Amino acid sequence: MLKLIVETKTLVQSLGFASSVVEKRNVIPEYANIKLSAKDGNLELSSTNMDLYLSQKIAVQVVSEGECTVSTKTLNDIVRKLPDSELTLTDLGTTGLEIKGKNCKFNLFTLPVSSFPAMDSINPEASFKISCTDFAKIIESTKFSISLDETRYNLNGVYLHIKDKEFCSASTDGHRLSISWVTLEKQIKNFGVILPQKSAEEILKIVKDPKNINEDIEILLSSNKIKFICNENTSMLSKLIDGTFPDYSTFIPESSSSKLVINRKMFADSIERIAIITVEKFRAVKLSLSRETLEISAVGEARGNAKEVINSSQDKESFYEYNSDESLAIGFNPQYLEDVLKAVKSDVVELYFSDVSAPVLIKFPENPKDIFVVMPVKV
């Protein structure tokens, strides 16, 4: 039966990832549990929520090989509260899993290992590797515009697709569009799948982990599943959304009549300040643009009003340039602008306008492989 010795700090992070995968209100006991498998000097932790399956391996001192399943939440809550020290985990059979730490001991009920689902196999139609840094970049640049409307299920994830040597991620909620891509080292089969929001968020946490961020991630694609293998010790298999993502190229404006170039941080900070006055029912800020100034204003029902003026400047920290003699007043949901401005770290941002009702194209000169489109609102 399973018996192993492990450092608390080694176990706590893996349990954090596992707990994040497991649904908080899972009514099926097997899916609320985590499977612990001790073998060959490693502890494998397996967790699932039926739509995605996470397997992690960490180095431990295996005294006796074996496996068992226990409540993910309970085990995670216990380990997080323990001081840094050695833990001994022992499967005692009918009396459960014993967790022995410094001056403390816990016994957790277990379920039969046979009731825990195994990770499905995948027959990949395409596979490739990219750096975790690049993968994190395209997911972070697009995840915020995923639709939360469950009736539009084909928009409830990020559209991962390969076209020639470009690996792209795109998402839209009907009001905004986010596209980010990286160039692969070699050309592979063109492909397109919709990764659910939950799966995108979970794999993003893993690739951003300090021990993985400088590694590569292998991606295996099939028509209904995707598998990620990171650092050889972590793999995640996810179901895909069965739907067709819209041809987003038709939403990207091809021309514009005016252009705003502005310091990204200054612009983001100003919008965030003015947005405080707005209310959830109708969130809108108005941008009034001219060659000399940008005025950002808002009126909040039962709150008041706010205004901030940015003057034309060529200084790096306060750069503002509007290239049209025709003034423009246009409204936006401030959250949509804030999300874009926070997604890409760049000194300046460019906004391309056609008229007050047309979608606005947003680009970052230092990050040419990120494109955003935001619909304006009436103000």
Curated annotation (Swiss-Prot):
Matching Gene3D superfamilies: 3.70.10.10, DNA Polymerase III, subunit A, domain 2 (3.10.150.10)
Single GO biological process annotation from the record: DNA strand elongation involved in DNA replication
InterPro entries: DNA_clamp_sf, DNA_polIII_beta, DNA_polIII_beta_C, DNA_polIII_beta_cen, DNA_polIII_beta_N
Top-level taxon in the UniProt lineage: Bacteria
SUPFAM superfamilies: DNA clamp
Self-association and partners: Forms a ring-shaped head-to-tail homodimer around DNA which binds and tethers DNA polymerases and other proteins to the DNA. The DNA replisome complex has a single clamp-loading complex (3 tau and 1 each of delta, delta', psi and chi subunits) which binds 3 Pol III cores (1 core on the leading strand and 2 on the lagging strand) each with a beta sliding clamp dimer. Additional proteins in the replisome are other copies of gamma, psi and chi, Ssb, DNA helicase and RNA primase.
Protein's recorded name: Beta sliding clamp
Native source organism of the sequence: Rickettsia conorii (strain ATCC VR-613 / Malish 7)
Origin organism lineage: Bacteria, Pseudomonadati, Pseudomonadota, Alphaproteobacteria, Rickettsiales
